[in-house]
Amino acid sequence: RGIGLNIAHKELKEGNRISVGIRDLESLKGSAIDPKKWPEGKIIINHYDALKKITAENWIKNTVDEFGGFDSVINCSGVLSKVPFLYKDGDEEDILNTLNINFLAIWHLCRLSWDHLCTSGRGRIIVLVSMSGKRSKGDLAAYSSSKFALMGLCQTMKNKGWEKNIRVSAICPSWVNTKMAQNISSLDKSSMTQPEDIAEICSTILKLPTQSVPFEIALNCNYEI
């Protein structure tokens, strides 16, 4: 949905084979990446739940069984939490859920993918982090903490994969015109970064030679001091 759907569609149009992990399989019926709209063998769809590690394992196994391997992983799942620093008793579950989805699930997926990325000789990991992984605005303590942790993971993966020609790119947008931003009234939707823009950036990163892959791309659709 949103960013992920646009990235997948862009890569299909560019001739790449893709393996998509999504929680709601039914949501892809009739969409731009519905497998029925593409030649056989171009796209496989897998059930993926960020809170269930077994679904990540099955996703990778299905991909390797179908394609023989893979060279890129793009992480764009996430959840918005409004839990503040002075959280209420009982909010701990929300905090842990946010950390599990925005941080640990991505760690699990990249760890499980690591050997395949090494084997490819030019592995690429792209992570949709957020400007909230670079600075904290307001009092979204749970969300910002999860994104700061994710940025730290990206830096560590970059270090770990450097000699194996694995390159990591952390994309850090502010508001993107997706369902997550649908209730934002302070900024017109047309003034936000569009999902298609993120897809274009990902496409460019995947085409770049190893020596030119950027680690961090910060995107501001609104002015920040």
Spans of model-derived segments:
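Active-site-adjacent segment of SDR/Rossmann-fold oxidoreductases
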Residues: 135, 156-166
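C-terminal helical subdomain
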Residues: 163, 170-171, 187-225
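Conserved mid-core segment of classical short-chain dehydrogenase/reductases
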Residues: 57, 80-96, 139-142
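Residue(s) in the substrate-gating loop at a strand-loop-helix junction
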Residues: 130
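Active-site helix of classical SDR
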Residues: 110, 146
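Rossmann-fold cofactor-recognition segment
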Residues: 38-53
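Canonical Rossmann dinucleotide-binding motif of NAD(H)/NADP(H)-dependent dehydrogenases/reductases
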Residues: 1-17
